[in-house]
């Protein structure tokens, strides 16, 4: 039977596999793609194709990531899988692959291991909202009590990092059996169960266009007789002519009104997420707005200077620092379109941070930036990137 033309009518969700090395993340990724492509169309991927993940760059950092697509009855999924632990750390911190939910793969034969814990912590820190567990290699464990024990351990670990351990779906199976075509409860049926858990447990994400209007300021022009035009790419939401907006960050928050939306030199009624636009602002002077601020729906985002973050520090080979840094290190933090200087406070048990490390830090900026949890940034020194981070919690 010929496959019909691919039509994107189903809602789109981004997911990924996380978990300890050799617990079966890549095998599971291949198994999901293989089982679901047979039912709903799409492309089956072999283990080797996924394992040979191509290199990509995100915020100046090279990351190996494999991208796989598959469909269920209700949705279209884009799934990321990383070959190495360092790739996961970089991927999650840079947001190269934003995840609406993660599939935590844990081997029933081994139970939770150090990277199981670290990936759950990372998911919490970078704002992955939902985790589903696939208890893999269940064909290697005959003892029901042992399986229950491992499940309990995983639930406790999720609880520890503020995920709802008791309510988290845990699917038992064997990715290897499923990939080999086994139709039993640990094979194909387990993949079907996992697909059902993905469909029901991870809510459909809000589309960018449905969010509160936000546009980072890239450039500001003064047009004689017309006023001040601010250009940038709308990050989320919709801006309509005549709406009141706020200018947030760096200085005191100001209110203004959008009196015109321009795109490719044409006047429009509105601009929406993804559009590169110029917005005409009523009564705003050219010197009142600068790169690094944002235009937003009033009250939707506030300026902050003090926050905790999860950061990855580039290794020397990646073009990062050659030496460690210590408490009170003061680099530039690049948020959206501009650099702001800030001071880093290290955790009490950490004397220094080596290139190639990832670490939780506290930051105090010298100027406020429009900020919310989950916002990504780069750490720079003299214009070159030396790290990447994500805001975990706002303090002030």
UniProtKB/Swiss-Prot annotation:
Domain of life, per lineage: Bacteria
Catalytic activity: GTP + H2O = GDP + phosphate + H(+)
Region (G1): 19-26
Ligand binding (GTP): 19-26, 81-85, 136-139
SUPFAM superfamilies, per the entry: EF-Tu/eEF-1alpha/eIF2-gamma C-terminal domain (SSF50465), P-loop containing nucleoside triphosphate hydrolases (SSF52540), Translation proteins (SSF50447)
Region (G5): 174-176
Record localization: Cytoplasm
Residues of the tr-type G domain: 10-206
Top EC class of this enzyme: hydrolase
Region G4, annotated ranges: 136-139
One term of GO molecular function: guanosine tetraphosphate binding
Principal subcellular localisation of the protein: cytoplasm
Keyword hit for Protein biosynthesis: yes
Sequence positions that bind Mg(2+): 26
EC number: 3.6.5.3
Keywords, ordered alphabetically: Cytoplasm, Elongation factor, GTP-binding, Hydrolase, Magnesium, Metal-binding, Nucleotide-binding, Protein biosynthesis
Entry keyword annotation includes Nucleotide-binding: yes
Annotated segments matching region G2: 60-64
Function recorded in the entry: GTP hydrolase that promotes the GTP-dependent binding of aminoacyl-tRNA to the A-site of ribosomes during protein biosynthesis.
Assembly and interaction partners: Monomer.
Similarity field: Belongs to the TRAFAC class translation factor GTPase superfamily. Classic translation factor GTPase family. EF-Tu/EF-1A subfamily.
Classification via PANTHER family: ELONGATION FACTOR TU, MITOCHONDRIAL, ELONGATION FACTOR TU-RELATED
Name the record gives this protein: Elongation factor Tu
Organism whose genome encodes this protein: Paracidovorax citrulli (strain AAC00-1)
Taxonomic lineage from the root: Bacteria, Pseudomonadati, Pseudomonadota, Betaproteobacteria, Burkholderiales
């Amino acid at each position: 039977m010929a496959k019909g033309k691919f039509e994107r009518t189903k809602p789109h969700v981004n997911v990924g596999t996380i978990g300890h090395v050799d617990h079966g993340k890549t095998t599971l990724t291949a198994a999901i793609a293989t089982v679901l492509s047979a039912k709903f169309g799409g492309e089956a991927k072999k283990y080797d194709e996924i394992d040979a993940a191509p290199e990509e760059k995100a915020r100046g950092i090279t990351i190996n990531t494999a991208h796989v697509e598959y469909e269920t009855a209700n949705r279209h999924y884009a799934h990321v899988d990383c070959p190495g632990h360092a790739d996961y750390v970089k991927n999650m911190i840079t947001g190269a692959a934003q995840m609406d939910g993660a599939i935590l793969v844990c081997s029933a034969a081994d139970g939770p291991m150090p990277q199981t814990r670290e990936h759950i912590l990372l998911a919490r820190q970078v704002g992955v909202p939902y985790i589903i567990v696939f208890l893999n290699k269940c064909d290697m464990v005959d003892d029901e009590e042992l399986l229950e024990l491992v499940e309990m351990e995983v639930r406790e670990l999720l609880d520890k990092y503020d995920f709802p351990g008791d309510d988290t779906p845990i699917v038992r199976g064997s990715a290897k059996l499923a990939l080999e075509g086994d139709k039993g409860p640990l094979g194909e049926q387990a993949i079907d169960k996992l697909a059902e858990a993905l469909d029901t447990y991870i809510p459909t994400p809000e589309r960018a266009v449905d969010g509160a209007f936000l546009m980072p300021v890239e450039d500001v022009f003064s047009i004689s007789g017309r006023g001040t035009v601010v250009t940038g790419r709308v990050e989320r939401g919709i801006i309509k002519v005549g709406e009141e907006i706020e200018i947030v960050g760096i200085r005191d928050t100001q209110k203004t009104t959008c009196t015109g939306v321009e795109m490719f030199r044409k006047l429009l009624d509105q601009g929406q997420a993804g559009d590169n636009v110029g917005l005409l602002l009523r009564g705003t002077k050219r010197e009142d707005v600068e790169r690094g601020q944002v235009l937003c729906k009033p009250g939707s985002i506030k300026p902050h200077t003090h926050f905790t973050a999860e950061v990855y520090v580039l290794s020397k080979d990646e073009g990062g620092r050659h030496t460690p840094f210590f408490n009170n290190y003061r680099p530039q933090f690049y948020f959206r379109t501009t650099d702001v200087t800030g001071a880093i406070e290290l955790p009490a048990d950490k004397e220094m941070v080596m290139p190639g490390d990832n670490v939780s830090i506290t930051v105090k900026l010298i100027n406020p930036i429009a900020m919310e949890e989950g916002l990504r940034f780069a750490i720079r020194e003299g214009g070159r990137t030396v790290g990447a981070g994500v805001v975990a919690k706002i303090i002030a």
